[in-house]
């Protein structure tokens, strides 16, 4: 039986309203100071890990109580995750740091079917969540009261530069074909693809963060956490397989002309990086201010190509979410997705593949993106993304795909997993499920709960009350 342990983080239950403050996410004009309360569900006698597989926080937003449900982002790192930096004399130093008990989560707000959350719990709560259609950011305050957090609407972050920022991909870069309805749009989990992503940080970005590699790593991990959330609606799973920081000097000529930088980075990946580290796609993060308001550039329809499965990204904002959306956008081009047009829809929200970054944060791919991505995958069949990467958060080696091994009922996780026993790979007493869009606190969500919002003129998908998966609506167009 699962016991619920209430841990009161702070006795203060009321928010404090502030007018202006400088935070890691930027200058914020209007914010609340809040004190989250943590509610932890752990099985009786279980050893509590540093970061639990599932957590709940009670907090106040606009003075109203909300409950934030969080689940650890399993598979965020590949089994062979590595980090590389360079010594002052130019020697390459590569390590395989332990990342099993990481602190990155996805989640939702209780009683808000359209809510999402992407949170780092490494040092307090830092990230974003969507509540009643509005995007909020949360981060710890550096005060003597260490449990205080600031929560604020994304729209209250001062814009660092009012000039429009855009993707450098144009029709000259794309292989244009008219958008059409794909016959394979009715996808199932068996179609899932897996991308092992490698990220490179240039020397300028290393210096921008004062040589603080830990801060850079935390930023990168949270941005990939956000990317992974966005791509799950395309049935694509992303795992970070490596980070390389050019701590001594740049390994290529990083210049304001994005096309030249992308070409150089692609050559370096093909002749150097791929010879020492297997991965599917690589992105270069740079502090360089690209010309013509460009903040990212990628080759179109190039996934798995040794040189062209690459992108370059300008670290253009202090807000993790904005840079993560740019990374997701450029990866989309590698997957054959073009810029959205007026006929594309994200259910009333801004779309990730818009050619110009919007002041309304984009969190979703459009109906057009969904069709184009799977048109590319089915026609070009990029082989490198067929294999499921080994995860770091398992006790025993996980089986490939969605099927479990003989006698297994769930994917083995950490010992603190409240739903799945990490030793036996069986559901714990009282648990119906361990993961899935229709699994909440180890139980199937009730029939009729929206598990996947519609894109464009399509229809919502609903839980059926008897399984953890999110079945496709049979009335989809």
UniProtKB/Swiss-Prot annotation:
Where is the secretion signal located? 1-20
Motif Cell attachment site: positions: 455-457
Q: Does the keyword Cell division apply?
A: no
Q: Which residues form the Peptidase M12B domain?
A: 193-389
> Pfam families from the entry?
Disintegrin, Pep_M12B_propep, Reprolysin
Q: Where is the protein situated, by its record's location annotation?
A: Secreted
What Gene Ontology molecular-function terms does this entry list?
Answer: metal ion binding; metalloendopeptidase activity; toxin activity
Q: Mind telling me which PROSITE patterns this protein's record contains? A: ADAM_MEPRO, DISINTEGRIN_1, DISINTEGRIN_2, ZINC_PROTEASE
Gene Ontology terms, cellular component aspect?
Answer: extracellular region; plasma membrane
Per the UniProt entry, the Enzyme Commission number(s) are 3.4.24.-
UniProt record, GO biological process = proteolysis
* Chief site of localization: secreted
Q: Which residues form the active site?
A: 330
Residue span(s) of the pro-peptide: 21-187, 390-404
The protein's UniProt keywords, in alphabetical order, are: Calcium, Cell adhesion impairing toxin, Disulfide bond, Hemostasis impairing toxin, Hydrolase, Metal-binding, Metalloprotease, Platelet aggregation inhibiting toxin, Protease, Secreted, Signal, Toxin, Zinc, Zymogen
Residues that hold Zn(2+) according to the record: 329, 333, 339
Q: Subunit structure of this entry?
A: Monomer.
Q: What is this protein called?
A: Zinc metalloproteinase/disintegrin
From which source organism is this entry? Bothrops jararaca
Q: What is the lineage of its organism?
A: Eukaryota, Metazoa, Chordata, Craniata, Vertebrata
């Amino acid at each position: 039986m699962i016991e619920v342990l209430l841990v009161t983080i702070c006795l203060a239950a009321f928010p404090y309203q502030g007018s202006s403050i400088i935070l890691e996410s930027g200058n914020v004009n209007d914010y609340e100071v809040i004190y989250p309360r943590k509610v932890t569900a752990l099985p009786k006698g279980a050893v509590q890990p540093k970061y639990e597989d599932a957590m709940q926080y009670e907090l106040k937003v606009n003075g109203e109580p909300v409950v934030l449900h969080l689940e650890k982002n399993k598979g965020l790192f590949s089994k062979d995750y590595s980090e590389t930096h360079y010594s002052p004399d130019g020697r390459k130093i590569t390590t395989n740091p332990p990342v099993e008990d990481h602190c990155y989560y996805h989640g939702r707000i209780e009683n808000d079917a359209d809510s999402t959350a992407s949170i780092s719990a490494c040092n307090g709560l830092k990230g974003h969540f969507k509540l009643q259609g509005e995007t909020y950011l949360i981060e710890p305050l550096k005060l003597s009261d260490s449990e205080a957090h600031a929560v604020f609407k994304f729209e209250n972050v001062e814009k660092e530069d009012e000039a429009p920022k855009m993707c450098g991909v144009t029709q000259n870069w794309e292989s244009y074909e008219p958008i059409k309805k794909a016959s394979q749009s009715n996808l199932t989990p068996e179609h899932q693809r897996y991308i092992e992503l490698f990220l490179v940080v240039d020397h300028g970005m290393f210096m921008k963060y004062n040589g603080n590699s830990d801060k850079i790593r935390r930023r990168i991990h949270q941005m990939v956490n956000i990317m992974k959330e966005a791509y799950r609606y395309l049935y694509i799973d992303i795992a970070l397989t490596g980070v390389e920081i050019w701590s001594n000097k740049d390994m290529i000529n990083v210049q304001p002309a994005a096309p030249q930088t992308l070409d150089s980075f692609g050559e370096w990946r093909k002749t150097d990086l791929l010879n020492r580290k297997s991965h599917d796609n690589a992105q270069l993060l740079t502090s360089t201010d690209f010309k013509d308001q460009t903040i990212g550039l990628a080759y179109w329809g190039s996934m798995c190509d040794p040189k062209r499965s690459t992108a370059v990204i300008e670290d253009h904002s202090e807000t993790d979410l904005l840079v993560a959306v740019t990374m997701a956008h450029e990866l989309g081009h590698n997957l054959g997705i073009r810029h959205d047009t007026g006929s594309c829809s994200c259910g009333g929200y801004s779309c990730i593949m818009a050619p110009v970054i919007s002041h309304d944060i984009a969190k979703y791919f459009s109906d057009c993106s969904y069709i184009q991505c799977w048109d590319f995958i089915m026609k070009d069949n990029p082989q490198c993304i067929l294999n499921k990467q080994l995860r770091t958060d398992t006790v025993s080696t996980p089986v490939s795909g969605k099927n479990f091994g003989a006698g297994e009922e769930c994917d083995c996780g950490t010992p603190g997993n409240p739903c799945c026993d990490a030793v036996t790979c069986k559901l714990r007493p009282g648990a119906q499920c361990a993961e899935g869009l229709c699994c909440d606190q180890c139980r199937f969500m009730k029939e009729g709960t929206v598990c996947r919002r519609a894109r464009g003129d399509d229809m919502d998908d609903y839980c059926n009350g008897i399984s953890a998966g999110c079945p496709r609506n049979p009335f989809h167009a």
